[in-house]
């Protein structure tokens, strides 16, 4: 009798075990390995490619631990690069332009601040020049995820007031974005996440400020997204020095630009900002307030 029960249990359990094993294999396949497992640990990643985008802008590609790894960075978060330069520890935040749809690598687009270019900063940018001088095969330490905002999809933003606060989830229909220079990278991250989901009906409005037309980072990528998703992504530029044939705005971000090219204030509108602190403090915040956007619906990366 015991032998019969044992045989019966194997007959009953075998299909169950088969289904369980199949489920586990599928689950494992659908969950790629994550590089940034612990935000307190530094992960050395190897430079595998360097692309010249413009006279002072580069795209750096770093290999993840395996071709099956993803970075593991939530939308809206950033990483820190750290290294020693002239004996001193230098740490800088960056937002990748690649996403977790990309396996095996992470891309950073960086504007290189060369020495003896700007009279106020004769030494140039320490980290950007370090990256510029890296050789293929060299490594640098990544740490993350970091940041106070996460885009959860379908208009939902989880925002914390500080690192110790619990996130508050805001659901919106429109996102107004003001970016200055390299501040475009977190905006592009959010825009791509919205547009890749056909069921996400959030509309993104980007006002992108630069010194000149040649300084506009990632312009081909932005305009391709606008052309493919014209009803869901609105794009406008302003530059300090405009060429003769220029179809966009000229000058610092002002009240008129915000009224004309960002969504109106409302319960279903969120404003995101990223750029030089003087731009945020003196151009963005005062003019957003004049237009009627409340501070609690404005977030600065």
From Swiss-Prot:
Domain FAD-binding FR-type: residue ranges: 40-152
One Gene Ontology term, aspect cellular component: endoplasmic reticulum membrane
Residue numbers of Phosphotyrosine PTMs: 43
Lipidation (N-myristoyl glycine): 2
Cofactor(s) in the UniProt record: FAD
Protein's UniProt keywords contain Thylakoid: no
Gene Ontology BP annotations: cholesterol biosynthetic process; nitric oxide biosynthetic process
Keyword annotations: Acetylation, Cholesterol biosynthesis, Cholesterol metabolism, Cytoplasm, Endoplasmic reticulum, FAD, Flavoprotein, Lipid biosynthesis, Lipid metabolism, Lipoprotein, Membrane, Mitochondrion, Mitochondrion outer membrane, Myristate, NAD, Oxidoreductase, Phosphoprotein, Steroid biosynthesis, Steroid metabolism, Sterol biosynthesis, Sterol metabolism
Pfam families: FAD_binding_6 (PF00970), NAD_binding_1 (PF00175)
Enzyme class, first EC level, given as a word: oxidoreductase
Modified residues (N6-acetyllysine): 42, 50, 120
PROSITE patterns listed in its UniProt record: FAD_FR (PS51384)
Binding-site residues, FAD: 92-94, 109, 111, 114, 126-128, 185
Catalytic activity from the UniProt record: 2 Fe(III)-[cytochrome b5] + NADH = 2 Fe(II)-[cytochrome b5] + NAD(+) + H(+)
The UniProt record lists the keyword Lipoprotein: yes
Function in brief: Catalyzes the reduction of two molecules of cytochrome b5 using NADH as the electron donor.
Homology family: Belongs to the flavoprotein pyridine nucleotide cytochrome reductase family.
Quaternary structure (record): Component of a complex composed of cytochrome b5, NADH-cytochrome b5 reductase (CYB5R3) and MTARC2. Interacts with MTLN; the interaction is required to maintain cellular lipid composition and leads to stimulation of mitochondrial respiratory complex I activity.
Protein name stated in the entry: NADH-cytochrome b5 reductase 3
Organism: Rattus norvegicus
